[in-house]
Amino acid sequence: MKTQKKEVYNFQSETKKLLHLMIHSLYSNKEIFLRELISNSSDAIDKLRFESISSPELYENDSDVKIQISINKAQRTLIISDNGIGMTKEDTIENLGTIAKSGTKSFLQSLEQKQNKKNELIGEFGVGFYSSFIVSEKVSVRTRFAGLESNKGILWESSGEGEYNITNIVKKTRGTEITLFLKKEEEEFLETWRIKNIISKYSDHITIPIHIQDYDKKNKTYFWEQINKAKALWTLNKSSITEEEYKDFYKHLTNDQNDPLIWSHNHVEGNQEYISLLYIPEKAAWDIWNRDNKHGLKLYVKRVYIMDNSQAFLPNYLRFIKGLIDSSDLPLNISREILQDNSITEKLRKSLIKKSLSMLEKLAQKNNEKYQIFWNQFGLVLKEGPAEDHENLNKIANLLRFTSMKSNNSEQKMSLKEYISNMNEQQEKIYYITADSYSSANNSPHLELFKKNNIDVLLLSDRIDEWMMNYLSEFEGKKFQSISKEDISLNKLTKEKKIKNKDVSTEMIEFLKKVKNILGNQVKDVRLTHRLTETPCVLLSDSTEMTTQMAKLFSAAGQSVPELKYIFEINPDHILIKKICTINNENELHQWIKLLLDQALLAEKGNLENPHKFISRMNKLLIK
């Protein structure tokens, strides 16, 4: 027989780095490699089932799908095989020679930075095949894609040290067979009982039968024993599933090694029939902030696997939810493209959004401590909701958490209902302020009048907050009001009244005119204010113009930002204003007015265009 020529390939540079991390430092819990390989085999069989719907010949007269594991102690090998879809030569290069996933560099950086969380991160990333090198000195893969001739088989071999070999072989059966040549110190994985325990622990709910070859000492024969239950857990009655089984299934589904925070299992009948099993993780994935990364639910139709990461059923702001949906109404041959425009999909989507939000509502009502864990991990993602989902706006708003002026700390624990329940009797609006940080918001001069009159204010300091507030106009009949806008009125709540010229001294009126003249078009207007108690002046945004925080958002996104012109308000009762009002030297008065404007700009924006000029001006005035 003619010897087939080996082709030598180099691993992609990032794959080399990942292999090095795995082999030398990654899993403290090494047994997970078997879970990863079984999961890959299960996926391969799921893909075969899906493809065979339109091409039944792919079964090659063998529809009895299974995963088999055998041990050879003499050769120190562990073999995991399946009769799934298999791989072509191109598939082996793409799937085994490179990490074909966006965000790889970020992932590797995260691994290096979080040495104590490597297991957790590698599970999130899901690079299952490479985990075989944790316990193996060499890995051999024999595979043939379903439907191809037997002489189109591929042998892939590597010791995980920089290169791999590919050879054409004859393989009579479709599917993939992985042979692990175990390291001497990993011989525990040659014990049948050990492999059975790992399968029961991690893969009991794989829907494909998993068999292990065992030896009958009495009859001196080998036999195949099925280890897992091979039942679709989500199809079972909720009352028959234990909490531990739900948790184990979540870990199998997501590769997350932590328990889920909560889950919701629903069997829906009627106009639409489906089963959903939705989980909320305990911790956010390392790439949760990347809206473009793959996310979504695993889709089944009548128990047949269709696709992973189907984004058609949940919006982006719920991308932290993991799980699956099994529909009885969708066609088996549905594609990703058709799924997006399908009327059944839209109905399922609406239903699943309501189930998801209801799950969070129940958690917030029944277990505030757990809900706070959720909020700390995923609150920023949920804040995208008001902009994306107007239909469920009130439900989302009810789930939001804030800190406030009266909270005296930065922890976001207050709901809008709680804020309203503590409002003053005649208060008609929900007051808030946005800033770059909690400290900036909590120390803003805009709060002075509210502190004086014991009116609470929500302090919003997350980057997304200003954007979110554009879509939150009211909650339970109470309108939201930014306290940094000019159109604020507290007349009903306080004894303060808008300052009128007749109530102000002639000197102060003249001073106001001078300030307007000096600042000219640097500001939109100059006014006396009733808002301030401790600060000499403050800047306000016009009610119709872009706010400071929104301008910062636009700028950070590379968008052009219109020039902001503020309303400059002066506190006539402040001692500094009274002193400046008496200055007769025109140049000195100019310097003081510009210094006041710079101070107000610094308080409002957190920075100045020319800080050196500000410092120089301040030093000169201090010397005087």
Swiss-Prot record:
UniProt region (A), positions on chain: 1-336
Protein origin, superkingdom: Bacteria
Region (B): 337-552
Database matches in Pfam families: HATPase_c_3, HSP90
HAMAP family xref list: HSP90
Family recorded in the similarity comment: Belongs to the heat shock protein 90 family.
Function: Molecular chaperone. Has ATPase activity.
Protein name (database record): Chaperone protein HtpG
Source taxonomy: Bacteria, Pseudomonadati, Pseudomonadota, Gammaproteobacteria, Enterobacterales
